[in-house]
């Protein structure tokens, strides 16, 4: 489990029944960063515009610098900087114990990153990582990966809509097929 800005534990079980788009970054990830929070906010907005208003999609960004991105630091970040209102629960920023985060991100999502290297000029150190978004269905199954810092929002919206339709139309034995299916294997890009 990881922690939200409010210090509350967030587990994969909390996301059950929700479609979730995971991303990975850190607060000091700016100019030359492969996937900054600003980039994620733009993707979130574009995907939101491409989806029907009633589509249940939660965005979760996991910090790759949990030693510096504490819950207190996440809480100081104004919601507007994340492209949301103060009461919008649809984008969670998570942090946690550095080792737990490494296990969760590497073991659970296959995202590997370096520890921040402290530069000599006093600026925050950079974390090296490959940008990635991961779409997880309401059963906790990874259904698609987008290995780019700026994925096509129409592609994500299409995939989310396919999952919504798939879940709505599956019953009995078809439901078992739904649970075992992986979007990136079943649907062409």
Please tell me what each predicted stretch does.
Residues 3, 92-96, 114:
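Short acidic-hydrophobic, aromatic-tinged amphipathic segments that line or gate anion-handling sites
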Residues 89-91, 102, 109-115, 128-134:
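Structural micro-motif
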Residues 19, 33, 44-51, 78-85, ...:
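Sec/Tat-exported extracytoplasmic proteins
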Residues 37-104:
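Structural microenvironment flanking redox-active thiols in thiol-disulfide oxidoreductases
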Residues 10-40, 59-60:
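Short active-site neighborhood of thiol/selenol oxidoreductases, capturing the structured segment around
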Residues 116-189:
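Thiol-/selenol-based redox modules, centered on thioredoxin-like
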Residues 1-10:
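N-terminal signal-anchor transmembrane helix
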């Amino acid at each position: 489990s990881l922690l939200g800005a409010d210090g509350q534990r967030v587990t994969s079980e909390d996301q059950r029944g929700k479609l979730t788009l995971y991303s990975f970054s850190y607060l000091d990830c700016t100019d030359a960063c492969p996937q900054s929070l600003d980039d994620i906010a733009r993707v979130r907005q574009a995907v939101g515009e491409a989806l029907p208003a009633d589509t249940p999609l939660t965005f979760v960004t996991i910090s790759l610098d949990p030693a510096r991105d504490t819950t207190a630091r996440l809480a100081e970040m104004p919601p507007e900087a994340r492209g949301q209102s103060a009461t919008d629960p649809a984008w969670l920023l998570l942090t946690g114990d550095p080792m737990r985060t490494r296990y969760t991100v590497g073991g659970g999502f296959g995202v590997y990153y370096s520890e921040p290297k402290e530069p000599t000029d006093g600026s925050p150190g950079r974390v090296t990582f490959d940008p990635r978004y991961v779409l997880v269905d309401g059963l906790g199954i990874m259904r698609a990966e987008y290995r780019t810092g700026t994925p096509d929002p129409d592609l994500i919206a299409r995939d989310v809509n396919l999952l919504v339709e798939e879940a709505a139309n599956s019953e009995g034995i078809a439901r078992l097929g739904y649970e075992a299916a992986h979007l990136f294997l079943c649907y062409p890009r």
